[in-house]
Amino acid sequence: MNRKKDKGFESPRPYKLTHQVVCINNVNFQRKSVIGYVELTIFPTVVNLNRIKLNSKQCRIYRVRVNDLEAPFIYNDPTLEVCHHESKQRNLNYFSSAYTAAVSAVDPDAGNGELSIKVPSELWKQGDEMKVMKVYIEFSLDQPKGGLHFVVPDVEGNMAERAAHVFSFGNQNSSRFWFPCVDSYSELCTWKLEFTVDASMVAVSCGDLVETVYTHDMRKKTYHYMLPIPTAAPNISMAVGPFEILVDPYMHEVTHFCLPQLLPLLKHTMSYLHEIFEFYEEILTCRYPYSCFKTVFVDEAYVQVSSYASMSIFSTNLLHSGLIIDQTPMTRSFLAQALAQQFFGCFISRMSWADEWVLKGISGYIYGLYLKKTFGVNEYRHWIKEELDKIVEYELKIGGVLLHPTFSGGKEKDNPTPHLHFSIKHPHTLSWEYYKMFQCKAHLVMRLIENRISMEFMLQVFNKLLSLASTASSQKYQSHMWSQMLVSTSGFLKSISNVSGKDIGPLIKQWVDQSGVVKFFGSFAFNRKRNVLELEIRQDYTSSGTQKYVGPIKVTVQELDGSFNHTLQIEENSLKHDIPCHSKSRRNKKKKIPLMNGEEVDMDLSAMDADSPLLWIRIDPDMSILRKVEFEQADFMWQYQLRYERDVVAQEEAILALEKFPTPPSRRALTDILEQDQCFYKVRMHACFCLAKIANSMVSTWTGPPAMKSLFTRMFCCKSCPNIVKTNNFISFQSYFLQKTIPVAMAQLRDVQNLCPREVLSFILDLIKYNDNRKNKFSDNYYRAELIDALTNSLTPAISINNEVRTVDSLNADVRLILEEITRFLNMEKLLPSYRNTITVSCLRAIRMLQKNGHIPSDPTLFKSYAEYGHFVDVRIAALEAVIDYTRVDRSSSELQWLLDLVQNDPVHYVRHEILSMLAKNPPFTKAADSSLCNEALVDQLWKLMNSGTCHDWRLRCDAVNLYYTLFGLTRPSCLPLPELGLVLNLKEKKAVLNPTIKSEQIPGLPEMTPSMTFINTLKEEHVVMDPALSGVAMAPLSLKRKAETPVGSAPEPGQVLQEEPSAKITLKSREEEDIDMDTVHDSQAFIYHHLNMLERPSTPGKEPSSVEQAILSMPGTPMPTLSKESTSSKHGEHHHHHHHHHEHKKKKKKHKHKHKHKHKHESKDKDRDSHAFVNSPASGLSIRSPSLSD
């Protein structure tokens, strides 16, 4: 591992956490609240440790004790409200900088936190080094908005009968939302977890269940869990509910939990989990690292699967019975991913956010190996191609994904991804889409490393990481071995070079340290004289999201004499490559042609070019570069490639290329593939849609029955009566998927009038009519849903005559038949719901298409009723998608408002996230176009949503930022009025200064600044503000401490700082109290000010601003609360502090002087207001003082 010898991991904290107790002694489902305490055992690493910073969000802190002494504390969370509510700023550049600064200010990886505890002086003033400190914190959570999710169904019965349950969730490190901790992946410790719950409930958590103790009255019981393996707080979780319990019949240390009445589904779903265990243990040659494993299936899950130490929480919707085909591979995949993350992600953690790619890469890579073993090589290669296409499309459209972001300084200027509208410095500022692509790229890069060093070495590296971690986990903390359980990029690379002896530096530099993919264009000519293939490969490396590739590239050429691999060197400026051919063109001899896999086949060579021996050419067939290839070869070459190349990726590429060649030979090649049983089913499904496109292009010359009809009839219909389908038999999954897909593809066929041919429609209606599933051992719900999708695909726009009113009577006869079928299906669903309500989902989509094509009146009412809380989640998402589409097409502000209300109030986090994602993908308007929907109220509402409305869910906040960006871009939204100009009269120098924040030009490289009216109005500086916009509401530079301010009349946030009106007794505090060592209490504020000041640095070159203007110029464009007697009275303490600080910073460089001075002025003012937090301990002054639990 790459670390300084014997130093271990360099911690950003002045102490080492060794053990933590979490005790939740009350879970109240009625009130949705929990009460408990934590106790952290820490070893100071400095003499005189006088302050401890921890992470805690939304917890109400009652008391803090350090070694049984009451300890004062300050709670400050700048992420609650990123920019103050008074701020007039509305541009995203500004928000992103402020948000990054706020997240950094409480980032545990930088040693920061929301909770700052002052160690009682009697503990550190003794002078000797403290051996150990125990920090005890009592806290409660009331109706948490993040971190813990309560599901309490609104039905009859007690909580257990209602299947009420609660579970922890979060995006990345989010444990601080439900208990105070060091919320960092690099701070490991051992754990003791206790949960007291009603006797009818079960509590599941990490580690081993040591004992379960009933209370005296037998009404409650306490579950005691011990986790002896050092684990990071973000990997700790809990779930409490009336779970049914299944001990895995194959592995007794594995236990599964599900909600009441789902046990039969659980048994079936989990019946093959042991195979996944065996597979991973075998390839890693390493035992599963924990002594037990628990799977918990919950409703309203945040994501499909989340992994924690020795347990995973899954969505209950992944459970299925043996009748279901389509869900099975999906659920298996999620289980395999969860188990891979147990090894890499939970057991082995990361040193810093920049090393996240290693863990995500390894777990994704070994999951891919499982996929290959279980579902076969074709499925695996198809998956790699899909993932590669996804990342290529994302990077070319949005911009590069950077796996290993390095930040040299604290300055935002060295932004490695200027093309993104969010910072990648923290996991909590990333868009969800970007993070998914990040994970996708990480495992693809691991595969590139495997190509370079071989799979054998790759698995040896993983084994080495695991065995080192395994040894370390059993050590006592004093041995400083625990850092071996953390992986870093450099440690991983060192391990690779030690094991394989190969230098993969260039590969890492290309794919990990920089972003972008490669874009190749290829074409060729055959030189008959020299018998040489002249290949030209060009690159586009100037477009967004691309990079230049220099290095080897493999080209495979299939000739008459066989298949030949060539490795070409892509140099700086070489485009043309000469490749010698092995075969002379000899078409007269009848001889079998050898393929790549050793097979020899007869081919009909009549289509090929008489002068050339080339059958087809492939660039980078192994996908060993992250690239997009656009290759030009003749249509007959693509047809040969489709028919005879055995690699599924090559077949997919050929199908895609043949869409551009709508000719009878293309039609024959595609039909042959459809009829080939040996061909991979996904390739055949893809060929169906390609054939439909080709048929539509050839509509005037097409002969015979509609495409695919005769094939379907031959495969699935009765011999005696070809229009009646056989009773369903889905024993062969290959033909099942084909049977589902062909009707959907056929429905895309169009005749000369661009309508779906009558023959096709009656064919689909007959399939629905004669569908018979009585003798089938599998459910046909997915098949019937696809038949409804086929009806939807057959719809074409209605021809309306002089805007007649649409009624059911005036419906076209065909459309009427479709509408009747959909209505019948929907009514049947109410009586006999299908698995996952697949039928309802398809019906809702069909109804929206009927509306969009003008057959029935456009109306969102039906969709809104299906989108209500209480319906199955898939149905809600389908209905919401329809409402979002309606909003865009009809420009409906009331529906947009309804959607945004759901985002703020819906109980299900996943649904809120999906609404914002779908709105960003299908926006009601974009920044390019004018729209009546774009108005000041909407800007304010979205700003409020991302500024403070989503502070308890990182993912949702980033979704809101995404939507804001989609609608308004980075700069000030165009629909906002320009702020009026303000004049500042400087009475000292007797001149007027134009408000310096109103600038005509923007400095390149700095975010745009909006002319927000920020003035400093203090008596000392003698400024008069003449500003029509803010007459009388001059703003005082209070610090971001106001973040925690609560609107008048609303209840305070739990644990939030309350501002008191400072009175004389505070300003005349004793000198001793003022000296309490809190000089960095507000480094979080200082940090943010530092960032914002850099943004808003005055642009007047040359002259150093005069001391008076200085205050105005360096004013950050942050929110400023109105001037009150508070800000004037806090002037008193300012002089004393100000000089003290100024002296401290004299050594700073001259040019930064005014900034620092300004910063400290704010800081000291705050400090003055805050230092009295400690006047009477423990939590008096600023924090909410509640009677302690033990009182």
Swiss-Prot record:
This is Transcription initiation factor TFIID subunit 2. It comes from Danio rerio. Gene3D superfamilies: Neutral Protease Domain 2, tricorn interacting facor f3 domain. Its main location: nucleus. GO terms for cellular component: transcription factor TFIID complex. Component of the TFIID basal transcription factor complex, composed of TATA-box-binding protein tbp, and a number of TBP-associated factors (TAFs). Residues 1163-1172 have a biased composition (Basic and acidic residues). It is found in: Nucleus. The keyword Ribonucleoprotein does not apply. The gene is taf2.
